[in-house]
Swiss-Prot record:
The gene is RPRM. This is Protein reprimo. Glycans are attached at N7, N18. May be involved in the regulation of p53-dependent G2 arrest of the cell cycle. Seems to induce cell cycle arrest by inhibiting CDK1 activity and nuclear translocation of the CDC2 cyclin B1 complex. 'Reprimo' signifies stop/repress. PANTHER family: PROTEIN REPRIMO (PTHR28649:SF2), PROTEIN REPRIMO-RELATED (PTHR28649).
Length: 109
């Protein structure tokens, strides 16, 4: 029997098994806590300070992106408003008063 093929079936059996022990072994094998360095000491995950710095950087980036979107929408709306006012003024200039404006009869109420 080919040893590589047997290893593949063991891995498939590990993932297809319904027991909690097999799932626990799979999770334990793939976490950062299980990494061992060359000198035999286990290397832990990222420390608390670097996690805090990463979180602050993520918040700052999200704030900058949010402000960019808000101001982009605001200035786009202002630009469209200015253009629409210009188009209205253009239409108003082309309109001429009717000759019938002077012929309005005002009666008693």
């Amino acid at each position: 029997m080919n040893p590589a093929l047997g290893n593949q079936t063991d891995v498939a059996g590990l993932f297809l098994a319904n027991s909690s022990e097999a799932l626990e072994r799979a999770v334990r094998c793939c976490t950062q806590a299980s990494v061992v360095t060359d000198d035999g000491f286990a290397e832990g995950g990222p420390d608390e300070r670097s996690l805090y710095i990463m979180r602050v950087v993520q918040i700052a980036v999200m704030c900058v992106l949010s402000l960019t979107v808000v101001f982009g929408i605001f200035f786009l709306g202002c630009n469209l408003l200015i253009k629409s006012e210009g188009m209205i003024n253009f239409l108003v200039k082309d309109r001429r008063p009717s000759k019938e404006v002077e012929a309005v009869v005002v009666g008693p109420y």
